[in-house]
Amino acid sequence: MPLRLEIKRKLAQRSERVKSVDLHPTEPWILASLYSGTLCIWNYQTQVMAKSFEVTELPVRSAKFVARKQWVVAGADDMYIRVYNYNTMDKVKVFEAHSDYIRCVAVHPTLPYVLSSSDDMLIKLWDWEKGWACTQIFEGHSHYVMQVTFNPKDTNTFASASLDRTIKIWNLGSPDPNFTLDAHQKGVNCVDYFTGGDKPYLITGSDDHTAKVWDYQTKSCVQTLEGHTHNVSAVCFHPELPIIITGSEDGTVRIWHATTYRLENTLNYGLERVWAIGYIKSSRRVVIGYDEGTIMVKLGREIPVASMDNTGKIIWAKHNEIQTANIKSIGADYEVTDGERLPLSVKELGTCDLYPQSLKHNPNGRFVVVCGDGEYIIYTALAWRNRSFGSGLEFVWSSEGECAVRESSSKIKIFSKNFQEKRSIRPTFSAEKIFGGTLLAMCSSDFICFYDWAECRLIQRIDVTVKNLYWADSGDLVAIASDTSFYILKFNRDLVTSHFDSGRPTEEEGVEDAFEVLHENDERVRTGIWVGDCFIYNNSSWKLNYCVGGEVTTMYHLDRPMYLLGYLASQSRVFLVDKEFNVIGYTLLLSLIEYKTLVMRGDLDKASEILPTIPKDQHNSVAHFLESRGMIEDALEIATDPDYRFELAIQLGRLEIAQEIAVEVQSESKWKQLGELAMSSGKLQMAEECMKYAMDLSGLLLLYSSLGDAEGVTKLATLAKEQGKNNVAFLCLFMLGKLEDCLQLLVESNRIPEAALMARSYLPSKVSEIVALWRKDLSKVNSKAAESLADPEEYSNLFEDWQVALSVEAKAVETRGVYTGAKDYPSHADKSSMTLVEAFRNLQVEEEESLENGDMDHEEVVAEENGNEQRNEDDVAEHVEEHHEEKEAEEEEGIVDGDSTDGAVLVNGSEADEEWGTNNEGNPSA
């Protein structure tokens, strides 16, 4: 029966003719040496060229990674070997190695050796720890030496293939070959060793269009592989799969079964002749070099063939070898750490007659079924004895121990617990997959049908593309995984039973409401298991998650691909296995799962009884779960993390609890958040305290100003000044009427122009003092601009109502320290829009009216006022006449006044030059 290997193309890159290929053991890189003389490193994950080296203008026929040194070593037709550091791109070494074309280089797996073979019929050994000295020469071939390769089972020996039609086996340290195989009728192009431990085989490819498998112990030909129509240029035994791969100049790659030597598959990607095949251990990736580019394919799935029963006994298959280990064999004194490999004692259990592609325990763990090569064999788990066998593409167990076999897409057989055939089913559709469990499931490409095991009656058809299916042990829940998401369904067993008991006919789609969709999650499930009502799975990002009631929790981020084996309740751990069969455990408390399950079922009383058994360090996980269920009060009681409890308290509006947490944590952001919430909730005392802790001075300003708290504003002004919050300090002082302090603050903050403007508006008596400071400060930058500043004491005519402003200041200083209460607002509301100058003028009018009402002798007042008015009129007339004369003089001299110079002030009869103005000559000033 065929292997049915799934083959996926992972990379396709066109290029010049590819003469050799190699895979990096740790990086996602392919090394290709080209006939054009270039080395290319392709990243097969990103599908782009990562690096390239221009080696020579002649063909580079062979190149290999030396990962432990971060090197690439290459041999070319110019007879030189070159070594590059692929990280720094530096050339490490260049030396002439042969007297003719270099056909192949091979790197020793552990020692600092490189073998090279050439058209000069020689093989040379190079030691890079001795400065790339040639430590040995192997002579014996009578034609070109096309390839050399080390024996992976004995790295002291190597094989060479030559166009003299022979294969020679050599020992390092001996110049003569151990023996020679007359391999083919024409030249031998390639040779490779079998990597498994059970067969002393090697394979050769020749210009006679055949590949041959040899036993190098008996020196006999085991098998000849015929089918290619041109020279066989590349061969390999796959290190992980039981297959042989051959490539030919006929453009095809053929895959052969390594045991039966049957042709399994033929690949033809239309890139002309095949020249090279590359692979690495522990990977199912194979890279192929063609005339027109490079192809990488992935053969089969990389999921390890392993199974664990409910007692912790693990059985896995390495090729045809079956091994076992028991988790419980680890001593109780050993402290298991999450994510670390378990030190299991591995034992050989036996071998399998077919190549295992799947392996699974039955529900009680007594039997193990192995599937592969289109057959299945049932073994006893303890002694590994053959219990039953047969033909089948797939094999599944029922939850009761029965089983089903899919022999083809149109025939499924069901067997009893004793492996006796019960019935045969021929579905009305093409069954591409089957799944076991509580019900028997059959899938086509776009739907799945569930049947009962007893009579194979249709339960329900569901239109979904199914990749995998996982049943809970209870049989009430099932997870259906597709390529992009998974669904949790509830199986209504009682409804189905009552339907069949009633004798009602079943519809074409099955029993209505047999399944109820509970949850859908947009994550791809790689592997999964059920523990109670908890579904544990790892996703496409290799996160280990579990899902209870639709709420997904990430347990761990896996650092490499791992696959779920099972769960042991006695250890509260879930176990996984990687591709190298390392077993790793992670803690998942059963009490935690039970608690979440009970909450989902609404049994809160029983859940509260289990809560004390959950360790404190898991309480936050419980709280997050409760929050997702809308049980925020319960989450607040259980949560232990202060930050999380604070957020929950804020959600609930429990400000007192939030305040206690804030006192404990002393986080400025928390105090600020709590202060804003307290303010909006009307808890002003709490808001004040929070804002003080948070140093939220702006918030305190809003609070104190809203409350009319002069004492608070006074303290805030001092605090703001200490903290350097000058804006807040200024507003506080201004609200308190401490204008001199405001002015001083502006000066100290080096805001002298603003201080001058404020003094002009509120403290005109201080203007001269501030202008002097301004001139002094500005003169350091622009002396002309400093000279242009006008002092109102010197040029009062340029400042409207200057004398009135001085009088207003003297009058206003009496009321500045008086803070009117909020209750008096109505009597002051009408005056709020009146300026001080207007108020002063109104005051003058009121005084005049009071004088007219008899406070003084009317005639004396009138006489005095007339005298004053006369003097004022004379002064005004004199001032107007002087101003008129000055204006005429200015017009004669061509001087423009201040109003016509965009506000520039005249000093000593000339316009002051400003930084952005013009000089006296009309040119732009510096």
From Swiss-Prot:
Matches recorded under InterPro entries: Beta-prop_COPA/B_2nd, Coatomer_complex_subunit, COPB2, G-protein_beta_WD-40_rep, TPR_COPA_B, WD40/YVTN_repeat-like_dom_sf, WD40_repeat_dom_sf, WD40_rpt
Family: Belongs to the WD repeat COPB2 family.
WD repeat segments: 13-52, 55-94, 97-136, 140-180, 183-224, 227-266, 269-309, 351-390, 461-501
Biological process according to GO: intracellular protein transport; vesicle-mediated transport
Any matching Pfam family: TPR_COPA_B
Residue spans of biased composition, Basic and acidic residues class: 868-887
Chain segments carrying region Disordered: 847-926
Name listed for the protein in its UniProt record: Coatomer subunit beta'-2
Assembly description: Oligomeric complex that consists of at least the alpha, beta, beta', gamma, delta, epsilon and zeta subunits.
Biased composition (Polar residues): 917-926
